[in-house]
């Protein structure tokens, strides 16, 4: 894993190439959450892209073209347009931003002579061929720029036209500040970390994190497994989790993982009690029970107070902490205590804390602890693939130092 991260660290950064009087296309990640009125509820990803954009402004780039996706549109969907982002961008950058409906319109605007201009292209996923990595679309985007900058870590594990494809055909292709910060932070967490190194994994499914868990056992010292995925491990150990969500097909995998952890001397911690309910969506009866005594027909929705105490003690002894995935159904206030408590606990330590996953970041924001974590990754799937020991495809096509 470290060798692959080192390979990705060898990618050239925007500071290593000339951007003055150049046309720069930056693949940013503005895939931010919106409320029902299409207002941005968390602009973290937009703010994280600002240093790269500002660097181009300060170094007098001729034109700056911002390309991003938003959501998963099926064709053109007005509710997923990037046009409403203009005012937020202009306020954050203190600079005019021109919206381009499509590439043809953008090309026409680029032919006009003017001082540094910033263009925001409409949601790239409105264009057919983006997610299929269409070569013609990639060449079209590459033709717009002298320098291509990938600053969208969250999509770097996907071979899409605006990330992987454009980089293949652009004359110069480098990473932005955010991409560099992401890789450097992950490398810091694993390259001679202060030990014990603790990994906390939560979320709904074992299947989504099984590869990660198998690959990371050689690098960690302690492992907390919580969230709905812990139900499968509890059942594998013989506990009756009643109506809780379980991936029965992965029972043997769970047992093999626990055995492997034991052989590698990785201490594994599972919940010892739980907050349960008869109905997670409309809870009428909520109970706290030891995991060996779950109420019939109840579902586990959060970790209980005894688990909180146990996990707190583990966290207090760990100078390096990685966390990916909530500990319960944190979207509902009744079952958010475990995840919120964990966020506060990690924030109160002196540990180097690296946080990944959209649900985890959302929980940390709700807890008001965003500024008290060492590093919060903007990538969900990309973070997982990195931890699984994979080289993210978009790094392969960027220019290397040697």
Curated annotation (Swiss-Prot):
UniProt keyword annotations, A-Z? ATP-binding, Cytoplasm, Glycolysis, Kinase, Nucleotide-binding, Transferase
Q: Which family does it belong to?
A: Belongs to the phosphoglycerate kinase family.
Name-wise, this protein is Phosphoglycerate kinase
HAMAP family according to UniProt: Phosphoglyc_kinase
Q: What catalytic reaction does the record list?
A: (2R)-3-phosphoglycerate + ATP = (2R)-3-phospho-glyceroyl phosphate + ADP
Compartments annotated for it: namely:
Cytoplasm
Its annotated pathway reads: Carbohydrate degradation; glycolysis; pyruvate from D-glyceraldehyde 3-phosphate: step 2/5
EC number annotated for this UniProt entry: 2.7.2.3
Q: Domain of life here?
A: Bacteria
- PANTHER family from the xrefs? PHOSPHOGLYCERATE KINASE, PHOSPHOGLYCERATE KINASE 1, CHLOROPLASTIC-RELATED
Q: Which gene encodes it?
A: pgk
Tell me the GO molecular function terms: ADP binding; ATP binding; phosphoglycerate kinase activity
Q: GO terms for biological process?
A: gluconeogenesis; glycolytic process
Q: Could you say which residues bind substrate here? A: 29-31, 45, 69-72, 125, 158
Under the heading Pfam families, the entry gives: PGK
- Heme as UniProt keyword: no
| Primary location group | cytoplasm
The record's GO CC annotations read: cytosol
Instruction: List ligand-binding residues for ATP.
Output: 209, 331, 357-360
Taxonomic lineage of the native organism: Bacteria, Pseudomonadati, Campylobacterota, Epsilonproteobacteria, Campylobacterales
Organism of origin is Helicobacter pylori (strain ATCC 700392 / 26695)
């Amino acid at each position: 894993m470290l060798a692959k991260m080192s390979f990705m660290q060898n990618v050239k950064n925007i500071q290593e190439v000339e951007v003055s009087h150049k046309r720069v296309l930056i693949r940013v990640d503005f895939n931010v959450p919106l409320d029902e009125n299409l207002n941005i509820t968390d602009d973290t990803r937009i703010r994280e892209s600002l240093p790269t954009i500002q660097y181009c402004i300060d170094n007098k780039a001729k034109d700056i073209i911002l390309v991003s996706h938003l959501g998963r549109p099926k064709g053109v969907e007005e509710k997923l347009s990037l046009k409403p982002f203009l005012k937020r961008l202009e306020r954050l950058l203190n600079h005019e931003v021109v919206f381009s409906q499509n590439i043809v319109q953008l090309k026409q605007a680029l032919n006009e002579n003017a001082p540094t201009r910033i263009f925001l292209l409409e949601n790239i996923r409105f264009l057919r061929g983006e997610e299929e990595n269409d070569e013609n679309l990639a060449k079209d985007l590459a033709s717009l720029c002298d320098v291509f900058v990938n600053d969208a870590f969250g999509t770097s594990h996907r071979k899409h036209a605006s990330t992987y494809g454009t980089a293949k055909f652009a004359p110069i292709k480098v990473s932005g500040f955010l991409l560099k910060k992401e890789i450097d932070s992950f490398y810091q967490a694993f390259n001679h970390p202060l030990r014990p190194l603790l990994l906390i994994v939560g979320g709904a499914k074992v299947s989504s994190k099984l590869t990660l868990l198998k690959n990371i056992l050689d690098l960690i010292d302690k492992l907390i497994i919580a969230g709905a995925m812990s139900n499968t491990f509890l059942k594998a150990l013989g506990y009756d989790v009643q109506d809780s969500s379980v991936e029965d097909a992965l029972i043997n995998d769970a047992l093999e993982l626990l055995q492997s952890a034991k052989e590698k001397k990785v201490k594994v911690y599972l919940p010892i009690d739980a907050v349960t309910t008869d109905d997670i969506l409309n809870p009428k009866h909520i109970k706290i029970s030891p995991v060996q005594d779950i109420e019939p027909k109840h579902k586990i929705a959060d970790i209980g107070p005894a688990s909180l105490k146990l996990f707190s003690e583990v966290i207090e002894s760990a100078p390096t902490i990685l966390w990916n995935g909530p500990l319960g159904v944190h979207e509902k206030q009744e079952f958010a205590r475990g995840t919120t408590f964990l966020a506060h606990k990690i924030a109160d330590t002196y540990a180097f804390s690296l946080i990944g996953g959209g649900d985890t970041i959302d929980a940390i924001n709700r807890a008001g602890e965003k500024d008290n974590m060492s590093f919060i990754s903007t990538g969900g799937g990309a973070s997982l693939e990195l931890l699984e020991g994979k080289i993210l495809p978009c790094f392969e096509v960027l220019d290397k130092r040697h």
